[in-house]
């Protein structure tokens, strides 16, 4: 299923060539701050000594998703990218502007809704353009690391495109606690890669602006499983053994039927039964207490950690195998 016509004999990014057995740090200039400070995207390229697949590992597409940045950074520090076959292109932090401003977006625009981008467009559009033109065209497949947003915590999970058979196989190899298919979103990175016949899986773990060790470690372990599967790193690299991913076939958000203060009585990732109490919504005066019950058997694959909620807010993401 995975193609064998590998192209990592010479990898070229921004006019710089990286041959077999070479590694290089490349910085792509994007723009300057109003102070004149140059903002660059750091790209690490680790090319093995023999031909093999080229994989992109990307963090920080959304600037506030710090778990995605930390897990890629930690693998750099731990020297997990000692590649002897194939090539790994590592982008620890794509959305530098969003990161500096602790924001998902870049100047009000979502980079992940800006693909394929434009060389002369907005900052978000230009960043999308350089990612596709300078980096992604080199790769055979990619892992895009994310977290939940707006204080929604995603239990470690892998998402793949329904029509992408290779993505499905990659998701199984990654072996996160949960995996499921997710429809393509127009102008997203995954959508553009699908159009370009580049399989992408998306790892989601934790929530924005919070470092969470469990989410970080699951992301690292899954990435190492993929690298080991393709013999890109040595077999003696230790990876923790997970139970086989639970494949979620149906998902729905349980939403608040009233406004108030929200408390949860279940843990993220927990298996729940139909009718089980999941949490409570109380008014600020202690007069009402609305009980939230599970509509079916399943697993909590994400939960809202924000205590002040309005009617209709998403509280629990329930997944059914």
Predicted regions and their residues:
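Structured catalytic-domain cores with a bias toward divalent-metal coordination
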Residues: 1-321
